[in-house]
A protein has these predicted regions:
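Histidine-centered, transition-metal-coordinating active-site segments
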Residues: 5, 9-240
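Alpha-helical phosphate/pyrophosphate-handling elements in metalloenzyme active cores
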Residues: 1
Length: 240
């Protein structure tokens, strides 16, 4: 229930703008371990749980923390190739985007086929569940190829990130990380508009309004892996 507690609006996009933003898993650790927050008190008093253990399961990739092996196993259930979050959002996104990729995934077969392997102290899948796993993996590939990484989505993402980056990198920016928590996506956009107006960032304002109103940049060129890839990428970096 708490694995997404560290999310802020557009966080999968904004957390790429490091070091201003932190990963939502790291933010979840900060929230859960804060003794002044109700979540910390409820975990200790109502559920008799150690908040550190809960934070370890969520923020298991944190290199600055020594994560016990038993917590890594639970983290593998929560966030892995077959985690419930992935099973949920891939099928749901497929349905609401009107693409058929999620229809081939047998969710019930997938869940019942997941077992614990005591020899390796890890999750395993029975032979009957192999086809269900393959369907999920292929669905994941198809969703990224055709939806998540579609050039229209990438255009909107790039425009929004640049609009935010121009604000945050300004020497007179007054926004802080905590300003992005506990607000809705609409409130975040209003906050950015106000800061762009105050700082006089007309270019960033145009990018933000273009994203909101779907006036997106068009595909200018397509670069495939090859000998000129580094040269072309450097050209675009120098251009901007």
């Amino acid at each position: 229930l708490l694995h997404d507690i560290g999310h802020y609006p557009f966080s999968h996009t904004l957390e790429e703008l490091m070091p201003f933003f932190v990963l939502h898993e790291e933010r979840a650790r900060q929230i859960i371990l804060d003794p002044s927050r109700s979540i910390n008190r409820v975990l200790r008093n109502e559920f008799d749980l150690d908040p550190v253990s809960v934070a370890n399961v969520i923020d298991y990739r944190n290199k600055s923390v020594d994560i016990p092996r038993r917590h890594l196993l639970l983290a593998n259930i929560l966030s892995g190739t077959l985690d419930p979050d992935k099973i949920d959002y891939l099928l749901r996104d497929s349905l609401f985007c009107g693409v058929p990729f999620g229809e081939s995934v047998n969710r019930d077969r997938l869940i019942t086929s997941i077992k614990y392997d005591p020899s390796g102290k890890r999750l395993a899948i029975t032979s009957k569940g192999v086809s269900a796993v393959e369907a999920l993996v292929f669905t994941n590939y198809q969703m990224y190829r055709n939806v998540y990484w579609h050039h229209t989505v990438r255009s909107a993402t790039a425009m929004f990130k640049r609009a935010v980056q121009d604000v945050l990198s300004h020497s007179s920016c007054q926004l802080r990380l905590d300003d992005f928590h506990g607000i809705s996506e609409s409130e975040l956009i209003l906050m950015l508009r106000e800061e762009q107006r105050r700082l006089g960032l007309e270019g960033a304002a145009l990018l933000l309004e273009g994203t909101v109103s779907r006036r997106l940049h068009k595909l200018g060129s397509f670069i495939s892996p090859g000998e000129r890839k580094r040269e072309l990428l450097q050209f675009f970096y120098d251009l901007y």
